[in-house]
Amino acid sequence: MSSVPANAPLRPIGILGGTFDPIHYGHLRLAEEAREALALERVLFIPAGDPPHRPAPGTPAAHRLGMVRCALRGHAAFRADDLELRRSGKSYTVITLETLRRRYGPRRSLVLILGADAFFGLPSWHQWQRLFELAHVLVAMRPDFPPPWGSEPPEDDPPEPGAGLPPALQDVLAERRAPKLARFAETPAGLVGFFRNTPLAISATTIRRLLYEGRSARYLLPEAVLRYITTHSLYQGDPGNP
Protein backbone atom coordinates (compact mmCIF):
# COMPACT_ATOMS: atom_id res chain seq x y z
CA MET A 1 0.00 0.00 0.00
CA SER A 2 1.27 3.47 -0.83
CA SER A 3 2.35 5.66 2.08
CA VAL A 4 1.43 8.85 0.18
CA PRO A 5 -1.80 10.39 1.56
CA ALA A 6 -4.68 10.55 -0.91
CA ASN A 7 -4.85 14.32 -0.52
CA ALA A 8 -1.09 14.91 -0.77
CA PRO A 9 -0.19 17.72 -3.21
CA LEU A 10 0.96 16.53 -6.61
CA ARG A 11 3.64 18.57 -8.32
CA PRO A 12 2.67 19.92 -11.75
CA ILE A 13 3.60 18.28 -15.03
CA GLY A 14 4.93 20.54 -17.79
CA ILE A 15 4.08 19.92 -21.45
CA LEU A 16 6.29 21.25 -24.25
CA GLY A 17 5.29 20.43 -27.81
CA GLY A 18 7.05 21.17 -31.07
CA THR A 19 8.37 19.65 -34.25
CA PHE A 20 11.87 19.42 -32.70
CA ASP A 21 13.43 19.37 -36.17
CA PRO A 22 15.95 19.34 -34.55
CA ILE A 23 15.68 19.91 -30.81
CA HIS A 24 18.18 22.54 -29.59
CA TYR A 25 19.31 24.45 -26.52
CA GLY A 26 16.50 26.99 -26.88
CA HIS A 27 13.97 24.23 -26.23
CA LEU A 28 15.97 22.79 -23.37
CA ARG A 29 16.56 26.11 -21.65
CA LEU A 30 12.87 27.04 -21.91
CA ALA A 31 11.92 23.72 -20.30
CA GLU A 32 14.51 24.12 -17.55
CA GLU A 33 13.41 27.65 -16.66
CA ALA A 34 9.74 26.62 -16.66
CA ARG A 35 10.58 23.61 -14.47
CA GLU A 36 12.36 25.85 -12.01
CA ALA A 37 9.71 28.60 -12.00
CA LEU A 38 6.86 26.18 -11.24
CA ALA A 39 8.71 23.40 -9.39
CA LEU A 40 7.51 20.99 -12.08
CA GLU A 41 7.86 17.30 -11.33
CA ARG A 42 8.77 16.71 -14.95
CA VAL A 43 8.51 18.22 -18.40
CA LEU A 44 7.16 16.12 -21.26
CA PHE A 45 8.70 16.85 -24.67
CA ILE A 46 6.06 15.87 -27.23
CA PRO A 47 7.16 15.88 -30.90
CA ALA A 48 4.30 16.85 -33.20
CA GLY A 49 3.11 14.30 -35.70
CA ASP A 50 1.19 16.44 -38.19
CA PRO A 51 1.07 20.03 -36.88
CA PRO A 52 -2.09 21.86 -37.99
CA HIS A 53 -0.56 25.37 -38.17
CA ARG A 54 2.56 24.70 -40.22
CA PRO A 55 3.87 22.39 -42.95
CA ALA A 56 4.63 18.84 -41.95
CA PRO A 57 8.21 18.38 -40.68
CA GLY A 58 10.70 17.31 -43.32
CA THR A 59 12.45 14.87 -40.98
CA PRO A 60 10.75 11.52 -40.28
CA ALA A 61 9.03 11.24 -36.92
CA ALA A 62 11.27 8.40 -35.75
CA HIS A 63 14.37 10.57 -36.18
CA ARG A 64 12.83 13.61 -34.50
CA LEU A 65 11.89 11.43 -31.54
CA GLY A 66 15.36 9.89 -31.56
CA MET A 67 16.98 13.33 -31.40
CA VAL A 68 14.73 14.33 -28.50
CA ARG A 69 15.67 11.18 -26.61
CA CYS A 70 19.36 11.90 -27.19
CA ALA A 71 18.98 15.47 -25.96
CA LEU A 72 17.15 14.45 -22.79
CA ARG A 73 19.46 11.63 -21.79
CA GLY A 74 20.69 12.27 -18.25
CA HIS A 75 17.98 14.86 -17.46
CA ALA A 76 15.91 13.18 -14.76
CA ALA A 77 13.04 15.68 -14.98
CA PHE A 78 12.73 15.63 -18.79
CA ARG A 79 10.84 12.90 -20.66
CA ALA A 80 10.26 12.25 -24.36
CA ASP A 81 6.66 11.30 -25.14
CA ASP A 82 5.61 9.92 -28.52
CA LEU A 83 1.85 10.10 -28.01
CA GLU A 84 1.27 12.45 -30.97
CA LEU A 85 3.49 10.36 -33.23
CA ARG A 86 1.43 7.25 -32.43
CA ARG A 87 -1.81 9.02 -33.28
CA SER A 88 -3.15 9.45 -36.81
CA GLY A 89 -4.50 12.74 -38.10
CA LYS A 90 -3.64 16.30 -37.15
CA SER A 91 -1.73 16.85 -33.90
CA TYR A 92 -4.36 18.96 -32.18
CA THR A 93 -3.20 20.08 -28.74
CA VAL A 94 -6.65 19.62 -27.25
CA ILE A 95 -6.57 15.90 -28.09
CA THR A 96 -3.08 15.61 -26.60
CA LEU A 97 -4.24 17.26 -23.39
CA GLU A 98 -7.29 14.99 -23.21
CA THR A 99 -4.96 12.00 -23.41
CA LEU A 100 -2.67 13.38 -20.72
CA ARG A 101 -5.59 14.24 -18.46
CA ARG A 102 -6.78 10.63 -18.63
CA ARG A 103 -3.25 9.46 -17.90
CA TYR A 104 -2.59 11.68 -14.88
CA GLY A 105 -6.11 11.90 -13.48
CA PRO A 106 -8.31 14.84 -12.44
CA ARG A 107 -6.17 16.14 -9.55
CA ARG A 108 -2.80 16.63 -11.24
CA SER A 109 -1.86 20.12 -12.39
CA LEU A 110 -0.94 20.06 -16.09
CA VAL A 111 0.91 23.06 -17.54
CA LEU A 112 1.07 23.72 -21.28
CA ILE A 113 4.23 25.75 -22.01
CA LEU A 114 3.88 28.19 -24.92
CA GLY A 115 5.94 30.95 -26.44
CA ALA A 116 4.34 34.39 -26.62
CA ASP A 117 3.83 34.18 -30.38
CA ALA A 118 1.97 30.87 -30.03
CA PHE A 119 -0.16 32.28 -27.22
CA PHE A 120 -1.16 35.32 -29.27
CA GLY A 121 -2.35 32.96 -32.02
CA LEU A 122 -4.26 30.71 -29.64
CA PRO A 123 -7.76 31.72 -30.87
CA SER A 124 -6.95 30.07 -34.21
CA TRP A 125 -6.30 26.69 -32.57
CA HIS A 126 -8.76 23.81 -32.73
CA GLN A 127 -11.17 23.97 -29.76
CA TRP A 128 -8.77 26.39 -28.11
CA GLN A 129 -11.06 27.36 -25.24
CA ARG A 130 -11.21 23.73 -24.10
CA LEU A 131 -7.48 23.85 -23.45
CA PHE A 132 -8.18 25.70 -20.19
CA GLU A 133 -10.51 22.92 -19.02
CA LEU A 134 -7.62 20.49 -19.35
CA ALA A 135 -4.49 22.42 -18.35
CA HIS A 136 -2.97 25.69 -17.25
CA VAL A 137 -1.09 27.77 -19.84
CA LEU A 138 2.35 29.18 -19.05
CA VAL A 139 3.51 31.84 -21.53
CA ALA A 140 7.24 32.45 -21.94
CA MET A 141 7.83 36.13 -22.66
CA ARG A 142 11.14 36.85 -24.36
CA PRO A 143 12.61 40.22 -23.40
CA ASP A 144 12.82 41.11 -27.11
CA PHE A 145 9.13 40.32 -27.73
CA PRO A 146 7.08 43.54 -27.83
CA PRO A 147 4.49 43.40 -25.04
CA PRO A 148 0.96 44.09 -26.30
CA TRP A 149 0.06 45.89 -23.08
CA GLY A 150 2.27 48.86 -23.91
CA SER A 151 4.84 48.79 -21.11
CA GLU A 152 7.00 46.27 -19.34
CA PRO A 153 5.32 45.01 -16.15
CA PRO A 154 7.25 44.72 -12.88
CA GLU A 155 9.40 41.62 -12.53
CA ASP A 156 7.08 39.93 -10.03
CA ASP A 157 3.78 40.99 -11.58
CA PRO A 158 2.12 39.33 -14.57
CA PRO A 159 1.15 41.63 -17.42
CA GLU A 160 -2.24 43.23 -17.71
CA PRO A 161 -4.26 42.54 -20.86
CA GLY A 162 -4.20 45.39 -23.34
CA ALA A 163 -5.31 46.59 -26.72
CA GLY A 164 -2.60 44.63 -28.53
CA LEU A 165 -4.22 41.31 -27.69
CA PRO A 166 -7.11 39.79 -29.63
CA PRO A 167 -10.39 40.47 -27.80
CA ALA A 168 -10.86 36.76 -27.10
CA LEU A 169 -7.51 36.64 -25.28
CA GLN A 170 -8.31 39.81 -23.37
CA ASP A 171 -11.39 38.03 -22.05
CA VAL A 172 -9.34 34.95 -21.16
CA LEU A 173 -6.79 36.97 -19.21
CA ALA A 174 -9.46 38.96 -17.41
CA GLU A 175 -10.95 35.68 -16.18
CA ARG A 176 -7.97 33.37 -15.84
CA ARG A 177 -4.79 35.39 -15.19
CA ALA A 178 -2.85 33.87 -12.28
CA PRO A 179 -1.76 36.51 -9.74
CA LYS A 180 1.24 34.31 -8.87
CA LEU A 181 2.72 31.29 -10.61
CA ALA A 182 2.47 29.34 -7.35
CA ARG A 183 -1.28 29.14 -7.98
CA PHE A 184 -0.64 26.64 -10.77
CA ALA A 185 0.09 23.89 -8.24
CA GLU A 186 -3.16 24.50 -6.35
CA THR A 187 -5.60 23.58 -9.14
CA PRO A 188 -5.41 21.11 -12.04
CA ALA A 189 -6.22 23.54 -14.88
CA GLY A 190 -7.71 26.85 -15.93
CA LEU A 191 -5.08 29.55 -15.29
CA VAL A 192 -2.78 31.62 -17.51
CA GLY A 193 0.57 32.85 -16.24
CA PHE A 194 3.61 34.60 -17.67
CA PHE A 195 7.33 34.37 -17.03
CA ARG A 196 10.43 35.81 -18.66
CA ASN A 197 12.78 33.26 -20.14
CA THR A 198 16.37 33.75 -21.19
CA PRO A 199 16.51 34.77 -24.86
CA LEU A 200 18.59 32.36 -26.94
CA ALA A 201 18.73 33.35 -30.60
CA ILE A 202 18.65 29.75 -31.79
CA SER A 203 16.18 28.33 -34.28
CA ALA A 204 15.77 24.92 -35.85
CA THR A 205 15.57 26.63 -39.25
CA THR A 206 19.02 28.17 -38.76
CA ILE A 207 20.47 24.86 -37.60
CA ARG A 208 19.08 23.02 -40.61
CA ARG A 209 20.44 25.65 -42.97
CA LEU A 210 23.91 25.47 -41.43
CA LEU A 211 23.95 21.70 -41.74
CA TYR A 212 22.67 21.73 -45.31
CA GLU A 213 25.48 24.15 -46.16
CA GLY A 214 28.05 21.87 -44.56
CA ARG A 215 28.79 24.34 -41.76
CA SER A 216 29.14 23.75 -38.03
CA ALA A 217 26.10 23.79 -35.73
CA ARG A 218 28.11 23.07 -32.59
CA TYR A 219 27.05 24.83 -29.38
CA LEU A 220 23.54 25.39 -30.76
CA LEU A 221 22.33 21.93 -29.78
CA PRO A 222 23.64 19.06 -27.65
CA GLU A 223 26.60 17.06 -28.93
CA ALA A 224 24.54 13.88 -28.59
CA VAL A 225 22.02 15.30 -31.06
CA LEU A 226 24.78 16.29 -33.49
CA ARG A 227 26.16 12.76 -33.31
CA TYR A 228 22.69 11.37 -34.04
CA ILE A 229 22.36 13.71 -37.02
CA THR A 230 25.76 12.63 -38.38
CA THR A 231 25.10 8.93 -37.79
CA HIS A 232 21.79 9.06 -39.65
CA SER A 233 22.94 11.52 -42.36
CA LEU A 234 20.17 14.02 -41.59
CA TYR A 235 19.97 17.52 -43.09
CA GLN A 236 22.15 16.73 -46.08
CA GLY A 237 21.72 17.29 -49.80
CA ASP A 238 19.21 19.73 -51.29
CA PRO A 239 17.44 21.51 -48.40
CA GLY A 240 14.37 22.43 -50.45
CA ASN A 241 12.53 24.37 -47.74
CA PRO A 242 14.82 24.29 -44.68
Describe each PLM feature range.
Residues 1-242:
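Nucleotidyltransferase catalytic core that binds NTPs
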